[in-house]
Amino acid sequence: MKILVPVDGSEPALEAVRHVLGLLGNGLKASLVLATVQEPVYLYERVLPPDADVLERVTGAVGARALADAEALCKAAGVSYEREIVSGDAAQAVLDLAGARSCDAIVMGARGLGAVKSALLGSVSHRVLQDAPMPVTVVKHGPGAADAEVRG
């Protein structure tokens, strides 16, 4: 089994990593792919020189920062992982990456946006939950949150 865990450096994303590490610690046999999705390169071009090498370095550095805490959790737990830094629309990039890496499941954090904000802004976790062909677990964050919401 291969599990994709998209992270953005936020606490809800780290909760998803902790959830997967707990499952692995309880005997689940799976490999782990940590991934982060960066803004499309054209957004960086507005504030940086139009140099492909510079843009690639900036995207990589920002992505590495987003992955750092998740990687530290995996290392502390003695769990090996693969890492991916991609750019584009967050939900679509997660869906594309899950397919490209032949992932069997996606585990991701929920932002906990209210219904109004979610309707106005859209929700990466909601879109992935609806569109992914594989099971998706959305790990809730915060006091009183249920352990996880699963579709699949």
Spans of model-derived segments:
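General small-molecule cofactor/ligand-binding pocket signal
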Residues: V33-A35, E82-V86, T137
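Short secondary-structure boundary segments
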Residues: T36, A110-R111, H141
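Intrinsically disordered or low-complexity boundary/linker segments at protein termini
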Residues: M1-R18, D131-G152
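Small/aliphatic-rich secondary-structure junction motif
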Residues: M1-P50, V79
